[in-house]
Design a protein with these regions (language model features):
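N-terminal, non-cleaved signal-anchor transmembrane helix
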Residues: 1-102, 114, 122, 280-292
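Short hydrophobic, aromatic-rich alpha-helical segments embedded in or entering the lipid bilayer
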Residues: 63-73, 234-245
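Alpha-helical membrane-interface segments at transmembrane helix boundaries
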Residues: 87-95, 128-135, 221, 243, ...
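Generic alpha-helical transmembrane segments of integral inner-membrane proteins
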Residues: 98, 102, 106-110, 138, ...
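Transmembrane-helix boundary motif in ABC transporter permease subunits
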Residues: 99-132
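Generic hydrophobic transmembrane alpha-helix motif, especially the helices
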Residues: 132-166
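Membrane-cytosol interface at the C-terminal ends of specific transmembrane alpha-helices
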Residues: 153-204, 210-219, 271-274
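C-terminal transmembrane helix and the adjacent membrane-cytosol boundary/short C-terminal tail
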Residues: 253-292
């Protein structure tokens, strides 16, 4: 064991010297003992305390239970007389979601190639990712408001709005899928004389195809839900009926019918989509789509 001498001549072992020069965490100031988790928790706690004011009522009517009772009296039972037009609007909503997802799929694939570090130069990756981030930052409802102003209150506005919004997410998902691939196959194909598109088709696409379909399916499910909401601002679909019936207390039973139909359709699509994604996951050995 190594020893050292202090000024008084006392012999100290090396381990004792290290302990003396490195104080235990309990002896450190409190701010030096904080880690990232503790700081994050403290910041969140302060944010919660400062947000208590959001729980205050409007002050107009604090009898919330009575309000709920009056609402339920007009909300139930549902008025099935509007079922036919509701189903027609649901079909339009589904068509909006399908067309938006299809267009976004075609736009996102080339953008994702430009956003993948293993496929594009750094400057192109930076520009493409910046564009995708900007597109993704704008909520689908705001995209709908913008498109309604430009093309009017119709289903085309909904298609354009959801296409832009979907491109932001699918471009991100697809680029991550491309970056997760094994490029050795693609490089080998290029080495034996394959053209760039051929190398992508036979070396890259088979690896990412399951994830591409899985992400696209998730986006379709999301767009069906979003298409039900953006119609509220005039972008076509079932949301326009929601807006019409919600504004009239005497039509809340019709609102209930529309809401129940949306619930049934969205639940069915979620179950169907989850089943398909599980099949894709089994075929690809456990890879699954990334959700947000």
């Amino acid at each position: 064991m190594e020893h050292s001498h202090d000024k008084s001549g006392t012999i100290m072992s090396k381990s004792e010297t290290e302990v003396g020069s490195n104080p235990s965490p309990s002896n450190l100031p409190w701010y030096n003992r904080l880690d990232v988790v503790s700081v994050t928790f403290l910041v969140f706690l302060l944010a919660v305390i400062s947000s208590i004011g959001a729980l205050e009522g409007s002050g107009r009517d604090l009898d919330y239970l009575a309000n709920l009772s009056r609402f339920l009296d007009k909300f139930l039972p549902p008025d099935v007389s509007v079922l036919d037009r509701t189903l027609e609007a649901l079909l339009e909503t589904f068509q909006i979601a399908v067309m938006a997802t299809f267009l976004a799929l075609g736009i996102s694939l080339p953008l994702a190639l430009g956003a993948a570090h293993n496929l594009a130069p750094s400057w192109m990756v930076a520009l493409t990712r910046m564009a995708l981030n900007v597109i993704r930052t704008i909520p689908s409802l705001l995209w709908a408001l913008l498109t309604v102003v430009i093309v009017g209150s119709n289903s085309l506005a909904g298609v354009i709005a959801l296409t832009f919004y979907s491109v932001g997410y699918l471009g991100k998902f697809f680029s991550e899928a491309f970056e997760s691939t094994d490029m050795k196959i693609t490089h080998a194909l290029r080495g034996i004389g394959a053209k760039p598109l051929q190398a992508l088709q036979y070396g890259l696409w088979p690896q990412v195809k399951p994830l591409i379909w899985s992400h696209s399916l998730w986006m379709l499910e999301y767009n069906v839900r979003s298409a039900s909401i953006i119609g509220y601002v005039g972008a076509g679909g079932i949301g326009m009926h929601l807006a019409l019936y919600a504004d009239s207390p005497n039509s809340w039973d019709k609102f209930c019918t529309v809401l129940l139909c949306i619930l049934v359709v969205v639940t069915f699509l979620d179950m169907l989509g989850e089943s398909i994604r599980l099949r894709i996951k089994k075929r690809t050995g456990g890879k699954s789509a990334v959700k947000v």
